[in-house]
Amino acid sequence: MSFPRRPKVTKSDIVDQISLNIRNNNLKLEKKYIRLVIDAFFEELKSNLCSNNVIEFRSFGTFEVRKRKGRLNARNPQTGEYVKVLDHHVAYFRPGKDLKERVWGIKG
């Protein structure tokens, strides 16, 4: 079963959309500054996750680091060989109520 390809939105697309939104509100901010803010935002997000902080954006969601247990029965898909996976940490996102409700209504 194959799924149809979904459109991909890049950081440049987001910068363009934010720039348009700002202009529609009669404000002026160059795209290079919008890009700097986005880059700084993601650096802060990564820095806080690496410090094991929980990052909460009300109604949007929560980012946190969770520990994933290791296992012995993992399989290398290229060789078929069984490998041991050690305990490790992963970034986790838990969507907020508003985001869940909005995504729930997506068609397709």
From Swiss-Prot:
InterPro entries: Hist_DNA-bd, Histone-like_DNA-bd_CS, IHF-like_DNA-bd_dom_sf. Histone-like DNA-binding protein which is capable of wrapping DNA to stabilize it, and thus to prevent its denaturation under extreme environmental conditions. GO terms for cellular component: cytosol. PANTHER family: DNA-BINDING PROTEIN HU, DNA-BINDING PROTEIN HU-BETA. Keywords: DNA condensation, DNA-binding. This is DNA-binding protein HBbu. It comes from Borreliella afzelii (Borrelia afzelii). GO terms for molecular function: DNA binding; structural constituent of chromatin. SMART domains: BHL (SM00411). Changing residue 89 to N: In strain: UO1.
